[in-house]
A protein has these predicted regions:
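Acidic/histidine-rich alpha-helical segments that form the ligand environment
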Residues: 71-105, 112-119
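Short, contiguous alpha-helical
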Residues: 2, 6-21, 26-68, 105-147
Length: 147
């Protein structure tokens, strides 16, 4: 039986997160297509920051979108790696039931927070797919048979 947390954070319901974020150039992740409010880079930056704010309890992690597009492709690759490592950390966190029961604020457990991150990630990954479609970069080459 598939682990629920692994399913939520890494593999479930749409292409693997690494595949979904693969094959993009610096130019593509920096584009803000007409009618869109953010670039792919900004969407992932926000999702990674929110994820980190919950996993690491770092309240400042996801406060503001970056003011400029990344200048170097390595910034994009680093952000993807940070996001994927954060998702792995969420899965690891969830493997201990006693940790899930920790109350992080009155009436809110760590399990509640992790569910929130999973839903938040799904929302922003969906926006990234929509942006990729708008700029002609979907499906990723790694998942061309899974649209």
């Amino acid at each position: 039986m598939m682990d629920t947390w692994e399913h939520l954070f890494l593999t479930g319901e749409f292409p693997a997160r690494a595949d979904l974020l693969s094959g993009l150039t610096l130019e593509q992740v920096s584009l803000v297509p007409g009618g869109a409010s953010h670039s792919i880079y900004e969407e992932l930056w926000h999702a990674a920051g929110y994820q980190r704010s919950i996993i690491e309890r770092d309240q400042a992690a996801g406060e503001h979108y970056p003011s400029a597009a990344p200048k170097h492709e390595q910034q994009w690759h680093d952000l993807v790696q940070q996001f994927l490592e954060g998702a792995q950390a969420a899965v690891a966190w969830a493997q201990a039931p006693d940790r899930l029961a920790i109350e992080v604020e009155p009436g809110v457990t760590m399990a509640d927070e992790l569910h929130s991150v999973a839903v938040h990630n799904a929302y922003h990954l969906g926006k990234i797919v929509a942006l990729r479609q708008r700029i002609g970069a979907w499906p990723p080459k790694a998942t061309t048979d899974e649209s």
